[in-house]
Amino acid sequence: CPNCLDETRYFMSLKEKDDFKSVRFVMVGFENGTNDKDRLQRLKKYARKMGLNYGFYLGGEASTKQAGIVFHALNGVYSFPTTLFLNKKGEIVQVHSGFDGPGTGIHFTRLQQTTEALLRKLLEE
């Protein structure tokens, strides 16, 4: 999905900033395909194409229902991408659904500001 691509590029750019080098990013992909082998191949191709510099896992088929099963602690997953922010104890402190990419102008700028402020706060804990 285009928003997933934009989010991946954004998170990869964060990993290049000194402030966020210690942040651990992990992607759980929900992919189209007839079976998990096909889905995993699609996910690996995506990771190679993007030059992914953080870990990735297959969550299952591309559906919000499947994502809700995998992330059963949430009250549901309603869109892709959905980002979970965890503290150092591994507790979910914030969930963000969707992604306002560069094409959204000021909305992308605001997303960057709020995301980076949250990450700085979590790193200080």
Model-derived features: positions:
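Short low-complexity, flexible loop/linker segments enriched in glycine and/or proline
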Residues: Q41-R42, F71-H72, F108, Q113-T114
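Thiol-/selenol-based redox modules, centered on thioredoxin-like
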Residues: S79-E125
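Active-site-proximal beta-strand/loop segments in catalytic clefts of secreted hydrolases
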Residues: V28-E31, Y57-E61, N87, H96-F99
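Nucleotide phosphate-binding site architecture
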Residues: P2, T34, V93
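Structural micro-motif
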Residues: G51-G55, L74-L84
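The canonical Cys-X-X-Cys-His
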Residues: C1-C4, T83
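Structural microenvironment flanking redox-active thiols in thiol-disulfide oxidoreductases
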Residues: L5-G51, A62-F71
